[in-house]
Amino acid sequence: MKATTQLRELLKGDDIIITPGVYDCLTARLAETVGFSAVKLLGNVTCGSLLGLPDLGLIGLNEMANHAKNVAAAVDIPVMVDADTGYSGGPLGIARTIKEFGRAGVAGIGMEDQVTPKKCALIPGGTPVVPIKEQVRKLQAAVEAREDPDFVISARTDAESVNGLDDALNRIKAYEEAGVDMVGVAMSWVRKEGMRQRTLDALQRIRDAVKVPLNCMFMDEAIQVGNVTLDEIKQLGFKMGGSNAVRYTVVKAVTEMLTILKNEGSTKNYSHRLASLKEYEALVRLPEFLEMEMRYSA
């Protein structure tokens, strides 16, 4: 089954699709190995891992599409891609973006309505957005440009951080009418403590605003800081939710290991936390390739 069709089938199911935010083939393989049904290739950490740069619109379409192609080929589960603002200021460029990602073999993309150059929505200070009509034209071009009807197009609005939730709700309604398959609202205030009721109320209003499947943006943050539960998010009818924890885990764990290596000259005192060579070889499917080599060399 095509990755696009797999994702469509998942969206028809009763459960929420939790998509860990991966950044390369290995993290995608790890997610698949432990049983996730789909992953999200994040722009933020891909920009950091490929270029060593922050998420400020510094990665381009070709870099992201080429990287996405490798990640999609490395796993047998659907890969959604964070396509930022679409890497173009107009509908013609957006159409090319959709075609490039479609040819890369990913299951779908998410596009946000920030101005260009964009910045990560988790950066304090708000994220300016383009006018609704401009974003609607982009999304209409995206929907029209897909060559595979199962290719999923998700639209996210960042308007809440600058214009409030009412404008964000108006936007996702307009994006739904433009023909996208899923919508989400980035909520800036989930970083604040004691926001449980406000978070729940906002999630309910988002659910009531549209009929298409909903992506719970920054779900980990909503649970940890907004103090809502995964069950509550499920009960509200959200179909997808992401986690940014992969990148934070890697930064923390690798820093700890490197510090021990630098200070002690070996990783002996960290070895209990290291994967074995056999585990790594299984992750990259070495036994499978060796068996294939044996068959063809016989």
Language-model-detected regions and their locations in the chain:
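Alpha/beta enzyme core
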Residues: 1-216, 224-241, 289-298
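Extended, intrinsically disordered, low-complexity segments
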Residues: 7, 244-298
